[in-house]
């Protein structure tokens, strides 16, 4: 066939045209020519991407997101560090290191089927390919919003399990930043190089916030006056924000926000004053979230999202003869962690509790947090004393959802929440008798011993 012959390509939703010379080196396409026409069950935008690759407009990397389609046309990829996987019958071409580091599922998957490297597509992973595509966008793009369904799918793939068990041997608890602490966005920085008073890492997104812990007490003003940051070995004084002194707990903790307009990823080097001793025990965290300051308190604007080990649903059976509902906090913990897991923790924190009722109004109800200071018995109502009174605030847009409005003070967060155990109870006092189940959605964070 002459190279200048016009070939019409009927896609699944439109029609395209190209010269025979453009597709001549693709036997999978040329073999389908009938009357100078090719009919394909391929979306137009995908076919345009493939034709632009044949036209040398785009590199082969441009086709990675549509590896499933490219493979059907005989286009194979061969880049070091990349592998094929099969999600729900759709083939993805992904970076192996990224998948292993971010998703615990694939760390085990690649290890178990190592003999198949680099083509694991013969093993079906029976999950939704559309949700997996969203997960890939989340892993590779900054400021990517996730739906609740996608968050649940992340749990299936064991997304960064280290998020849920933070090792803090040298430190106590946060005062104001409990919401930050529970944020799904936190990631351990495991590739950070700590040498003397210098920390080196890589900034992968346009904005990262680093939570940094120190072994000794620190002076915020000294840090602000003496800290230095280099981006790609160039001194920078505009990309640093150390949050105010009120957000330091035990004088061992700060937030640093780094922003860069440089081409990403870029190398970051943070140098602290000589008197500063940095902890190297997995105590550096990075996150990519927006934060705003309200009444002197930094709040994570995405803190309402729940993830694995957070947001479990707990059903409470209520005696219809009572005008109050009593919930042992221990039940909230054992509903998530088994006894073997709990034994590994020094504390488990519970926060962000939302009550969901079944067509029943909790209007006029109020909440008390009580504690038995005499013994460790689980049923401690008789000897308990009230340590905090809280109000129930109706969640926006819902008639049946109520959030506990805890008094947000340093003393309460520090002295109560970190010590939740079997002798704490949440008591909901009602105006009317309650009938039916009560559902709770809440967060937990486990602190290793």
Swiss-Prot record:
This is Putative BTB/POZ domain-containing protein L742. PANTHER family: BTB/POZ DOMAIN-CONTAINING ADAPTER FOR CUL3-MEDIATED RHOA DEGRADATION PROTEIN FAMILY MEMBER, RE57120P. Belongs to the mimivirus BTB/WD family. Residues 79-148 form the BTB domain. GO terms for biological process: protein homooligomerization.
